[in-house]
Swiss-Prot record:
Single GO term (MF): glutamate-5-semialdehyde dehydrogenase activity
Gene Ontology biological process terms from the UniProt entry: L-proline biosynthetic process
Known EC number: 1.2.1.41
Location in or out of the cell: Cytoplasm
Keywords for this protein: Amino-acid biosynthesis, Cytoplasm, NADP, Oxidoreductase, Proline biosynthesis
Pfam families per record: Aldedh (PF00171)
Reactions that this protein is recorded to catalyse: L-glutamate 5-semialdehyde + phosphate + NADP(+) = L-glutamyl 5-phosphate + NADPH + H(+)
Top-level EC class as recorded in UniProt: oxidoreductase
Protein name: Gamma-glutamyl phosphate reductase
SUPFAM superfamilies: ALDH-like (SSF53720)
Length: 415
């Protein structure tokens, strides 16, 4: 089955690569319209997925990721329309010039070809990835988690209907709707057809892909994100940032999981933090110093292993550190190179933090929640890469392209 999907996807990618920006935008507009027109069928499938997942004991954080509402589906359709408004990078000349040999050389952006994406209980990913791949002239093979297989199947049918209506091959967007996990291992070996693989899931999935895939893999999306409260931090705005970073949508990978507090501000800051977290319904997981805090927030002892895990819930590690060195060392040991922030009024400390924390996104006096394709002005994102090759941070349109060198001559030969 996968062999035939790969053959069809590769054939479709050749046709997509030749489309103009206008032709690609018309397809995206049609997809957005069809998502709204077929909302009832998609939501009906999603209800079945959510009910099954709840019966299987899926966590509330994962159920939140899985669930669609009319408002969420409308927002997904609007995101597709936003992709239409983004500049098409395909065909863009990156650089070039006339060489001494007389050869005119240019480096031009081109589609990758076929992209494979493996993801879990995130039905929005189906549309986000499909729209970005189509905008950049790529075909895509999707493998969502078993929790979303009804929703994904319904969504892909809508997308394929739009493709067909626009005279394009339905194989431009395909989904592996069989929940058999053995198919993942088979997909990892499809380097003959898939040019890049993006796993969006937990550490286990990423490890499997890195170890077993014969396809170039871009990993990311695991966010053990930190905020360091420096000794010079202004407490009131610092608390506002922390509340946003923890509570706006706890199930996301850019949510803060560990708060590092400079010991010189701890005595003044921690009581205010406890009060604010109690109002926000956040449970604090504190180290020995924090456990001595008497405040209204729910407080439990921090377990060492929690420093390396995503809570994806209203839980927050709080650790008091001796100084900036301690904060940076902690992030290097426990961070996932996703998003980390410093709250400070000392711009020298801010500059040092930015230079020494090796994460895809580093913030000064701002929430980690900004690490997102839409917030960065990239449109919907395929993933947030925490590696350094071929892309880093939110992966927008350019991350779905490569380049080719093109030489123009006039009977030009090498001397």
């Amino acid at each position: 089955m996968l062999e035939q999907m790969g053959i069809a996807a590769k054939a479709a990618s050749y046709k997509l690569a030749l489309l103009s920006s206008g032709e690609k935008n018309r397809v995206l507009e049609k997809i957005a319209d069809e998502l709204e027109a077929q909302m009832e069928s998609i939501l009906s499938a999603n209800v079945q997925d959510v009910e099954q997942a709840r019966a299987n004991g899926l966590s509330e954080a994962m159920l939140d990721r899985l669930a669609l509402t009319p408002a969420r589906l409308k927002a997904i359709a609007d995101d597709v329309r936003q992709v239409c408004n983004l500049a098409d990078p395909v065909g863009q000349v990156i650089d070039g010039g006339l060489l001494d040999s007389g050869l005119r050389l240019e480096r031009r952006r081109v589609p990758l070809g076929v992209v494979g994406v493996i993801y879990e209980a995130r039905p929005n990913v189906t549309v986000d990835v499909a729209s970005l791949c189509l905008k950049t002239g790529n075909a895509v093979i999707l493998r969502g988690g078993k929790e979303t297989h009804r929703t994904n199947a319904a969504t892909v049918r809508v997308i394929q209907k739009a493709l067909k209506a626009c005279g394009l091959p339905e194989a431009a967007v395909q989904a592996i709707d069989n929940p058999d996990r053995s198919l993942v291992n088979e997909m990892l070996r499809m380097d003959k057809y898939i040019d890049m693989l993006i796993p969006r899931g937990g550490a286990g999935l990423h490890k499997l892909c890195r170890e077993q895939s014969t396809i170039p893999v871009i990993t990311g999306g695991i966010g053990v994100c930190h905020i360091f409260v420096d000794s010079s931090a202004d407490i009131a705005p610092a608390l506002k940032i922390i509340v946003n970073a923890k509570t706006q949508r706890p199930s996301t990978c850019n949510t803060v999981e560990t708060l590092l507090v400079h010991q010189d501000i701890a005595e003044r800051f921690l009581p205010a933090l406890s009060k604010q977290m109690a109002e926000s319904g956040v449970t604090l997981h504190g180290d020995e110093t924090v456990m001595q805090l008497h405040g209204p927030a729910k407080l439990v002892p921090l377990k060492p292993e929690e420093l390396d895990n995503e809570f994806l819930s209203l839980d927050l590690n709080v650790v008091v550190v001796e100084n900036m060195d301690g904060a940076i060392a902690h992030i290097r040991e426990h961070g996932t190179q996703h998003s980390d922030a410093i709250l400070t009024c000392d711009m020298h400390n801010a500059a040092r933090f930015v230079n020494e924390v090796d994460s895809a996104a580093v913030y000064v006096n701002a929430s980690t929640r900004f690490t997102d394709g839409g917030q960065f002005g990239l449109g919907a994102e395929v993933a947030v890469s925490t590696q350094k090759l071929h892309a880093r941070g939110p992966m927008g349109l350019e991350a779905l392209t490569t380049y080719k060198w093109i030489g123009f001559g006039d009977g030009t030969i090498r001397a």
